[in-house]
Amino acid sequence: MKKHFHYLLLIVFTSSVFNSCIEDPKSDKFVHHHEFPNLSPNRDNLNISVLLDLSDRINPEKYPSPAMEFYLRDVGYLRSIAENFEAHVINKKMIKIDDKLQVFIDPEPSDNTLNTKLNALKISFDKSDVTKKRILETCRKYDSISTLMYEAAIKDDDYVGSDTWRFLKNKVKDYCIEEGYRNILVILTDGYIFHKNTKMKEDYRTTYLTPQDVKRFGFNKPGWKEKFEQKDYGFVAANENLSDLEVLVLGINPDIKNPYEEDVIRVYWSKWLEEMQVKNFEIKQADLPSNMEKVIQDFILKKTRYQEEQ
């Protein structure tokens, strides 16, 4: 029966050739409209965490983007993450399903409504409770609920910043890393780090980086990289031995007034992740979600050691 269920899932849903999950306005049902790639059923258990930066980077008035507002790009990235999580689960043997997807905001929101939305985005499947309907609700939930979250944050207009540094110091091991899983952390951020309660400086290392800091450090002119290396600039290491964590950074949005800005952000993040022993990471600029679909798919659905051993 279990084999039959899994077989039906693959036959029915890999034939879909559309692009999103949408609700049917005439009923409680929804129509599933995106394609599932055909993957090996022998796949690692996935534990995917997403850390959202709800600072003023998402403010469409302060940072307008005619092609697509940055908060809508985030929503598109979240939808793509959910779609690939669905594809991963759909392709696994039912008896081996044990996979998780969750979203975090740091600092934790005081708004109970927002906490309820975050809780709704905490999804897990195992062989005892997985159903076709629950799997296929994932991208719809992520699309609709994340849109409401971003719109509420913009309407509230109280951007306290995102404490990315402290999350990686105090919470990432407890919240995002579990034994027996392939642990992935996706960070949606413009690449700058700042929170009013986490401002520390150790020699030329900091727990923050803003466009003003880049300019103040002299990283807006030729020779910036030599200075960066000689003085040992960078982020203060927030943790050590995160070798069981893979990190995908999406949404880098450098200040266009400095031609070196993107390179500076990339060097800061790369050095930081390497020093924390993150072995697999990618850092991607803010692009349209349609252009990022393959990047996200390749990172989440890549062939793993478990598959190679089968």
Predicted regions and their residues:
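Bacterial Sec-dependent N-terminal signal peptides
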Residues: 1-39
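Von Willebrand factor type A / integrin I
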Residues: 21-23, 212-310
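Von Willebrand factor
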Residues: 43-122, 126-180, 184-186, 193
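Extracytoplasmic/secreted cell-surface and envelope-processing proteins
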Residues: 58-62, 111-114, 194-198, 257-260, ...
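Flexible, glycine-rich surface segments
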Residues: 162-246
